[in-house]
Structure formats: C-alpha cells, structure tokens
C-alpha cells in the first residue's frame, strides 16, 4: 500500500490510515507521527494493522460522496487506490452524510463534501504557501478566511 502521498509535507496524524503496530505498545500508532528509535520492532502489515486500516478507510468513505465515476479524480484518486489495496468494494457503514456548500472564491474552489479531514490542504496553505487562509473549524471540515 502506498501511503507516502497522504503524508507529503504533512504529518498531523489525522487520517490514521498509516497505523502500525509497535512491539511493547498496546495501541496502534500513526507511522507519520512516530519517531523511529533504535531497536524498535514495527509491524506494518499484521492482521491487526490491516484490519484497523480497512476500518478507518471504511469510516472515511462512509461520509464521502460515492460519485467516483463522475469525479474529475477518477482513475488517479488516492482514496480509490487505498480502498482498492485494502480490498474495499462497497461502503459497509451507511447513514446520513454531512453536506456543505461549495466554497468558492477568486483563488480557490473547494468541495468540503469530499473532505476526509487529512488536513493536507490546511498544512499546505498555512505552512508551505504561508497564506494562512485555512483553519480547522470543527470535526466536519474547514472554512476559509476569505469565504463566508
């Protein structure tokens, strides 16, 4: 499974797709937030790890529009690739999904209905481009400082 793209210039540990099992620790840990230590024994593909990753991905997809065939990212979508690698063929958890208005401004158009809360856009905007226009609002998405 290729997880590097989700962590490019970003490691808030928010998505939990990269969890690993570390010998001597009870809980799984996000690999993007875990410092390597001498003698550390890490399992990256144990049944426990793969089950946790699959469950996390299923939960992410449960609040994500099932519009893959009409999405402009179809065929080169990281979510599709990870879901495929984890053997996810259908959405196991169903229910009411969050809905947001599309956030439009002269500089950006963002569809928060597709947000998976990885915080990559916030990190890139604030830390890499140093614009500071995006901030975390709550568990349901982000709001730009320019659009209301």
Residue ranges of predicted features:
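A basic, amphipathic helix-loop patch mediating RNA/tRNA/ribosome contacts
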Residues: 1-23
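Fe-S ferredoxin-like electron-transfer domains
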Residues: 16-17, 22-148
């Amino acid at each position: 499974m290729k997880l590097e793209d989700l962590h490019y210039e970003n490691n808030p540990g928010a998505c939990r797709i990269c969890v690993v099992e570390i010998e001597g620790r009870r809980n799984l840990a996000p690999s993007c937030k875990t410092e390597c230590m001498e003698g550390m024994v890490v399992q990256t593909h144990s049944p426990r790890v793969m089950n946790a990753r699959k469950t996390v991905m299923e939960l992410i997809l449960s609040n994500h529009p099932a519009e893959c065939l009409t999405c402009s990212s179809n065929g080169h979508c990281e979510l599709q690739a990870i879901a495929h690698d984890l053997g996810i063929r259908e959405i196991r958890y169903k229910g009411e999904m969050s809905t947001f208005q599309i956030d439009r401004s002269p500089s950006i158009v963002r569809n928060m209905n597709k947000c998976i809360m990885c915080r990559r856009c916030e990190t890139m905007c604030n830390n890499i481009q140093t614009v500071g226009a995006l901030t975390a609002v709550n568990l349901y998405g982000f709001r730009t400082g320019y659009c209301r």
